[in-house]
Amino acid sequence: MRSHYCGNLNKSLAGQTVELCGWVNRRRDLGGLIFIDMRDREGVVQVVVDPDMKDIFSTANQLRNEFCIKFTGEVRVRPDSQVNKDMSTGEVELYATGLEIINRSEALPLDFNQTNSEEQRLKYRYIDLRRPEMSDRIKLRARASSFVRRFLDENLFLDIETPVLTKATPEGARDYLVPSRVHKGSFYALPQSPQLFKQLLMMSGFDRYYQIVKCFRDEDLRADRQPEFTQIDIETSFLSSNQVRDITERLVHDMWKELLDVELGQFPIMKFSEAIRRFGSDKPDLRNPLELVDIADLLKDVEFQVFAGPANDEKGRVAVIRVPGGASLSRKQIDEYGKFVGIYGAKGLAWMKVNDRAAGLEGVQSPVAKFLNADVVNGILERTEAESGDIILFGADKANIVSEAMGALRIKLGDDLELTDKKAWAPLWVIDFPMFEEDGEGNLHAMHHPFTSPLGMTAEELKVNPAAANSDAYDMVINGYEVGGGSVRIHNAEMQTAVFGILGIEAKEQQEKFGFLLEALKYGTPPHAGLAFGLDRLAMLLCGTENIRDVIAFPKTTAAACLLTNAPSPANPDSLAELAIAVKFAEKKDA
């Protein structure tokens, strides 16, 4: 039906007869001529319908926006005075010699010229995706997927599929369960990742594996998360963590160069401890110049217990952010920032305006200045390199609360005060994560997953002091988003059993849940390491949007619902009976 795409017409085709299929983007009647802006996935071209072509002209009079049509015609070069520089096809137009209305359209539930609610856009997603902005995003995502496959194929990786119906394993989030009709009362789990299967592939001798794969997590959603998401899953044998990072960094570097013509340069490497200390986050946005500065040692002897308490607590932290020019912030603005850090558990936000740096204590304005002597104030000013006109914002509490609250405040200040360079790209690697983290009740949990290898420790050493262990893990971060994470894996049964034991998984449970893995580790398992990228997140960054739903053709809402199909929905009672499942809702308790 079609010989060319609308958006691909140019002067080199002048004089040729072409056939185009697409949609009416706009219709105009001017000076007896009808002009149709015709659109397909590649762009828009202007079609001219001459009244001398009576049958075509009569049909063109019936056209309305979003009619699906086919035009046949001659490509003509526009006069210089009529060139439209705002269109990629603006140097040419199509002189119509044939027109077919393939399908008419009713009035649209979306208005392409206005901002529509996200609910409407998701309900009528098939129409929303016709918008050039959305179409361009989906196409760029497709190009990214194609690039990944080409790059990994060229680097000797094998594309191998792993099961979707599998066994539930503890990987940090709830599983989506699928009941078995054959094995009544038993359930499959949809994979949160192909983690164990890709490790088994390494044990099978396939030393370079990849897969672009759907994964599923039943967790609370955010703007950059979905219940089903796509991973670029990678695993290797006989490569160190440095070598895995080198390959995957080249993949992203070359992707940005090919798709955006952006040179990312070499990615800096930062330890987890440094990232938390300087930025309050293990995924720092390095485009933002603000940093956290620790000052606990300066405050140990002050009488103000809000500062002295955390300063003398080994699990406490006192850190500040110096905001250049921030002395101009109003009290109302500062109070709003105080409410903001409260979201993260902070009890308040102390502040100090530096009106005259040279005057020391006498030159600052602060509700807490009366609790501090001149030496302490001068020490804070010196350490933060404060200047006249700056403001210093204080966080004092348990270390995790201060890091999270002040890290989030740093991002907000960078956005609000336009300190973050939104046009820049700032990738980095974060390495040497803690092996375990506490849950608040003294129990240890794997920070990544329980198959991650500790860094430079034997199984016996790990058992002696697990809380002090670091893992051979690494995350790739771009502009404050974790786009990929990986690690060296445990490749012997002794270490894997030790890690399970530290996590409170008893021997019987180990066999029930991971017996197949522990058995496989007995048979010459090679050292192996890997990484998984979030394709949705990579596409989000490539497209310059902050909402992951913008780069997924048919996404779910933050309530994990599909407004287009009304999924999830109640199951047919007969289907439930066949599965031996009864649905019972918890009874509401009286207030």
From Swiss-Prot:
Residues 195-198 are annotated as: Aspartate. ATP binds at R217, D218, E219, Q226, E482, G534, L535, D536, R537. It is found in: Cytoplasm. It comes from the Bacteria. It catalyses: tRNA(Asp) + L-aspartate + ATP = L-aspartyl-tRNA(Asp) + AMP + diphosphate. One of its GO terms (cellular component) is cytoplasm. SUPFAM superfamilies: Class II aaRS and biotin synthetases, GAD domain-like, Nucleic acid-binding proteins. Pfam families: GAD (PF02938), tRNA-synt_2 (PF00152), tRNA_anti-codon (PF01336). Keywords: Aminoacyl-tRNA synthetase, ATP-binding, Cytoplasm, Ligase, Nucleotide-binding, Protein biosynthesis. One of its GO terms (molecular function) is ATP binding. L-aspartate binds at E171, R217, H448, R489. Its main location: cytoplasm. Gene3D superfamilies: Bira Bifunctional Protein, Domain 2, GAD-like domain, Nucleic acid-binding proteins. Its EC number is 6.1.1.12. It is an enzyme of class 6 (ligase). GO terms for biological process: aspartyl-tRNA aminoacylation. HAMAP family: Asp_tRNA_synth_type1 (MF_00044). Homodimer. Belongs to the class-II aminoacyl-tRNA synthetase family. Type 1 subfamily. This is Aspartate--tRNA ligase.
